[in-house]
Regions:
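C-terminal catalytic "cap/lid" subdomain
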Residues: 1-229
């Protein structure tokens, strides 16, 4: 199976706070799956690092385009952490555009990137890479157990185990979430996945073994899928 793995900023926040054990466990899990024949394309989110730097730059009067550039640079720093952890299994640099990503992927190494274009989330980057590579599955490792019918901190919030693209769009339109807290999935990424009918499994990033469970099709997190599947 070819998998696009989006490692959300939450994971790198944990690494910054707690040390390298979590990212090391991610590498073990990815390489274990790789030995079983699964291919990985990896995208790193920005997390608190990006939010902090964007906040400082905003207070200094930086333009939105500069804020976008700062966010991209922070995701690339996190990508370098993942590359360092993967060692010689990884392509040595995070590609900065899709053409370079595809060329790097053909090297047979595990390619890790951050953001690509201003105004585009790493969700959208992962979705486009999934489309370019004809990935069988996109997995998003995030700070929640999956998609809920409302904010997960609200009383009575229920995890949705399976949801169609259209239902996901409805939830996005009905609920608003503060940036950097609970993140469902970027609507642009959702549209990209829908047009290519690529399923996305959204799971909690606290346990790297969730990657294997998602690949195996186990009932974990939330599966976002097309009506034709």
């Amino acid at each position: 199976m070819r998998v696009t793995l989006l490692i959300g900023g939450y994971v790198f926040d944990r690494v910054a706070q707690e040390g390298t054990e979590l990212i090391t466990e991610y590498v073990r899990t990815i390489l274990e799956a790789n030995k079983k024949g699964h291919e990985f394309a990896i995208v790193a989110g920005g997390g608190k690092l990006a939010r902090d730097y964007i906040g400082i730059a905003r207070s200094l009067g930086a333009s939105k385009s500069v804020l976008d550039d700062i966010g991209i640079l922070c995701t690339r720093l996190n990508a370098y952490l993942m590359i360092s952890a993967l060692g010689d299994k990884a392509y040595p640099h995070p590609p900065s555009n899709y053409r370079d990503y595809l060329s790097a992927f053909l090297s047979g190494k595990i390619v890790v990137c951050g953001g690509m274009s201003p105004g585009q989330s790493t969700d959208a980057v992962a979705a486009l890479i999934s489309e370019y590579l004809h990935s069988d599955l996109m997995i998003k490792m995030t700070s929640a157990e999956g998609v809920y019918d409302r904010h997960p901190k609200e009383t009575g919030a229920k995890l949705i185990p399976k949801i169609t693209y259209s239902h996901a769009r409805k939830i996005i339109s009905e609920y608003s979430y503060d940036p950097g807290t609970y993140e469902l999935i970027d609507p642009i990424a959702l549209k990209i996945l829908e047009r290519s009918n690529i399923p996305c499994r959204i799971v909690h990033g606290k346990d790297p073994k969730n990657i294997l469970k998602a690949i195996e099709g186990r009932n974990i997190g939330t599966l976002v899928y097309g009506e034709s599947r």
